Amino acid sequence: MRLMPSLSFPPRFFHRPRRAAIALMALAALAGGAAHARQAAQAEPLPAQIIRLAQQGRTDEALAKAREYLEREPQDVQMRFIQSNLLAQSGRTDEAEAALVQLTRDYPELAEPYNNLAVLHAASGHLEKAREALETALRLDPGYATARENLGDVYLRLAASAYEQAAARPESAGEARQRLTDKAAAIGKLLR
């Protein structure tokens, strides 16, 4: 069951490859020189290279480049956020969570780390922690649609859990139990 959308890089943290770099790569390709194309690719900003590697499924390579970059620029919030996403995508959720928690401490005004922290909390079954993180994200950025959708999903999961727990209680019998079970099942369908 998918509780929330997968982790995503927030667009406002991204810098698209500069038009000049793209034009340079195209020019090098037209000239037919592989060496020129390699030089042009090196003109691509490192964050864009890392994102491209991740999109190609080369997460370990992207993580290595992110680490290398952060050794030189340890306070680069964009790269730290990208690194946390890469860690999560590679299954290193404890490291991703630690990186996101540190981002929330260093940059408490940013909503995105709270949203992605909530995704990790929800995935590990900590729905109350996820709710708290999402509510923080929305206090910081009330227009953050992804966080709002994710909070709705968390509320649905919490409701389904409450119905399931109520149905399992000994005092819930017959029609009441069936009603509670049906409600939990209906919510489960919404979350698929």
Question: Where are each of the predicted segments found?
Answer:
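Terminal, low-structured helical/coil segments at or just beyond the last alpha-helical repeat
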Residues: 39-44, 156-192
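Short coil turns that delineate tetratricopeptide repeat
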Residues: 74, 107-108, 142, 171
